């Protein structure tokens, strides 16, 4: 780990990229405290302070890094964009004609354009829903409501696209994946508050928090982090033999299939897909008994919420991994390059790879699901503060560890392109292990 931090400060270009990334994330944090025009911050603070840990409002606030409770310009984060991306990818996967349209640079540009159009639609819908939610907060809206709706929708939609631009700037000039780091930073800022609440609960006799349980949970937290790292690196290697030109000899290689090829994306997608309808329903909770009933069933970290989250994680693990690693495309590429899999006929290669992928994806999705239910277990068994249970496991921990590992891989790739992987192999041994 020491070598990693040294590289961030001793390699000039990498240092500049790292500092630029921190600067962009700092701008995101500043924007999280800038409220939408027409909102009374004092009324908001009083309202959110009165909300229980189990409320939908606190759930939104947790994953937005505090932007939701401030009704800030970034209160939707990049959720609308992720929702739009899911819809577009589902359509492309379902319709072969759309899949053909995506081929080539021109096709990919069209897909990006349609995704941005859908992002606007999703942001407008969510912006309208949050406007209705603000109307239900006593004294929160200080201007005529019809005017506030227009201002709020325009502001949060613009805020979402500003964050997308931030993410693109990090991709081009910074370190790591920009959109993932924005989500990551929003969760990390809640870590300090969660730990503070934990130690505060230990000192409060009415909370009845056993210090032994605290040590146990922290130990479990460390163990889970280690398991996530190992799961992230785990892979099955399939031997491949390539025939040499003008020779009877073969060259042996292998095809690595990760336990979870899509990384942290299924968890992010599942979280966003749950949040979207919850945000819309919360806007109508004041006037609709049906919306209130659905929200009560989908209480964060409740049974139905956890069950739905697990189903979505499993579904997105299979869906997104099959998009990234198509058995048909892989088998075609192996055959084109004169490769064979020992013991497998050429025309059965696709079926074999599909079976192997299904087995690895099943194990990977079950692991992610087990991690996802940890907050539910911690909250209901040990009665820990709600934000503490979210940090100790589940989607938040998977996102934090997954994005951190992805960033390390980006750093490793950059160092290799700059010639550090050979000349300074000893100094970057930690990165090589990752």
From Swiss-Prot:
Highest taxon, organism lineage: Bacteria
Membrane topology reported for the UniProt record: Multi-pass membrane protein
Residues annotated as transmembrane: 19-39, 73-93, 117-137, 148-168, 179-199, 209-229, 264-284, 300-320, 362-382, 391-411
Cited PROSITE patterns: SECY_1, SECY_2
One Gene Ontology term, aspect cellular component: plasma membrane
One of the GO biological process terms: protein transport by the Sec complex
Main location: membrane
NCBIfam families on file: 3a0501s007 (TIGR00967)
Known function: The central subunit of the protein translocation channel SecYEG. Consists of two halves formed by TMs 1-5 and 6-10. These two domains form a lateral gate at the front which open onto the bilayer between TMs 2 and 7, and are clamped together by SecE at the back. The channel is closed by both a pore ring composed of hydrophobic SecY resides and a short helix (helix 2A) on the extracellular side of the membrane which forms a plug. The plug probably moves laterally to allow the channel to open. The ring and the pore may move independently.
Protein name per Swiss-Prot or TrEMBL: Protein translocase subunit SecY
Taxonomic placement: Bacteria, Pseudomonadati, Spirochaetota, Spirochaetia, Spirochaetales
């Amino acid at each position: 780990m020491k070598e990693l931090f040294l590289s961030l400060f001793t390699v000039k270009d990498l240092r500049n990229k790292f500092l630029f990334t921190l600067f962009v994330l700092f701008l995101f944090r500043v924007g999280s405290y800038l409220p939408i025009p027409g909102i009374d911050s004092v009324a908001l603070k009083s309202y959110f302070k009165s909300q229980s840990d189990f409320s939908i409002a606190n759930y939104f606030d947790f994953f937005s890094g505090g932007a939701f409770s401030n009704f800030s310009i970034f209160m939707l984060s990049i959720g609308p964009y992720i929702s739009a991306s899911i819809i577009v990818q589902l359509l492309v996967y379902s319709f072969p004609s759309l899949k053909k349209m995506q081929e080539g640079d021109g096709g990919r540009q069209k897909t990006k354009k349609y995704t941005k159009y859908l992002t606007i639609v999703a942001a407008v819908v969510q912006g309208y829903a949050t406007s209705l939610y603000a109307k239900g907060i006593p004294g929160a809206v200080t201007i005529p409501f019809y005017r506030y709706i227009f201002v709020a929708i325009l502001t949060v939609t613009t805020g979402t696209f500003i964050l997308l631009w931030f993410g693109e700037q990090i991709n081009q000039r910074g370190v790591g994946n920009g959109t993932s780091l924005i989500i990551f930073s929003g969760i990390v800022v809640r870590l300090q508050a969660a730990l503070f609440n934990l130690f505060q609960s230990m000192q409060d006799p009415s909370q009845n928090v056993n210090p032994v349980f605290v040590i146990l949970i922290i130990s479990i937290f460390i163990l889970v982090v280690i398991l996530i790292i190992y799961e992230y690196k785990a892979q099955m290697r399939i031997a491949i033999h390539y025939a040499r030109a003008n020779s009877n000899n073969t060259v042996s290689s292998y095809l690595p299939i990760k336990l979870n090829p899509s990384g942290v994306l299924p968890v992010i997608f599942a979280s966003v897909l749950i949040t979207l309808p919850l945000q819309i329903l919360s806007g109508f909770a004041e006037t609709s008994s049906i919306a209130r009933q659905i929200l009560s069933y989908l209480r964060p970290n409740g049974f139905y919420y956890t069950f739905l989250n697990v189903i979505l994680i499993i579904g997105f693990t299979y869906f997104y991994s099959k998009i990234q690693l198509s058995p048909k495309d892989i088998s075609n590429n192996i055959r084109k390059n004169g490769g064979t899999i020992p013991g497998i006929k050429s025309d059965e290669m696709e079926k074999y790879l599909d079976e192997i992928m299904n087995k690895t994806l099943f194990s990977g999705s079950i692991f992610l699901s087990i991690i996802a239910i940890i907050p539910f277990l911690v909250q209901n068994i040990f009665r820990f503060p709600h934000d503490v249970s979210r940090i100790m496991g589940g989607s938040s921990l998977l996102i934090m560890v997954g994005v951190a590992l992805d960033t390390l891989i980006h750093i490793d790739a950059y160092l290799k392109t700059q010639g550090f992987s050979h000349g300074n192999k000893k100094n970057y041994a930690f990165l090589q292990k990752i």
